[in-house]
């Protein structure tokens, strides 16, 4: 990203993948916490930012859960036109891959707020380390579920080895290029 770009707009990602509704079709408490954090961010933007009209909430959830979460956001005062429910994300890494491909096309990228359980901060950090220069902020919500449930969610979020392999190949190629630049004579001697 070039240095002369400025932030234009806001994208709030409310991450609610892999949730199970309670028996009475109610949202679990940890999702209600995420909705509360999302609503606070939305209200803060609406009260203070000049680019508030260019704000969208990208809700990552399944169809059934997404409609219930959307209704809760509407009850909290969020405009319906600002909410987009997307159920095609496999995990946090996939979400950012798709989102950043769209954002890179914009001349001035938006500020991105990622709302999830605070236990997913390390996954968020790993996923977003490749997007330096963009304003991406983690907003953690409390998650009081048992550790087993949280760890089960984390297993679903594991970054694929494919991403790691691509990074390793890129690093190896850079090292090779650097060594070839530093020691160009070694290659010439070997080929003779």
Regions found by a protein language model. Give the residues of each.
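Non-Sec secretion/translocation targeting segments of pathogen effectors
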Residues: 1-3, 191-192
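A structural signal for short, hydrophobic/glycine-enriched beta-strand patches
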Residues: 2-160
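C-terminal capping/extension of enzyme domains
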Residues: 146-192
């Amino acid at each position: 990203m070039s240095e002369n770009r400025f932030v234009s707009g806001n994208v709030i990602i409310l991450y609610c993948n892999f949730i199970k509704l309670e028996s009475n079709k109610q949202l679990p408490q940890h999702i209600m916490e995420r909705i509360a954090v999302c609503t606070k961010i939305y209200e803060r933007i609406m009260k203070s930012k000049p680019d508030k009209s260019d704000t969208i909430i990208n809700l990552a959830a399944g169809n059934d859960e997404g409609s219930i979460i959307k209704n809760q956001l509407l009850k909290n005062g969020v405009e319906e036109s600002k909410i987009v429910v997307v159920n095609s994300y496999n995990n946090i890494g996939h979400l950012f891959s798709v989102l950043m491909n769209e954002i890179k096309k914009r001349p001035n990228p938006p500020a991105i707020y990622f709302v999830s359980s605070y236990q997913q901060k390390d996954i968020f950090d790993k996923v977003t380390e490749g997007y330096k220069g963009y304003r991406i902020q983690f907003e953690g919500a409390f998650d009081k579920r048992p550790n087993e449930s949280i760890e089960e969610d984390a297993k679903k979020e594991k970054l694929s080895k494919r991403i790691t392999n691509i990074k390793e190949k890129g690093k190896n190629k850079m090292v090779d290029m650097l060594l070839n630049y530093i020691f160009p004579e070694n290659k010439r001697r070997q080929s003779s």
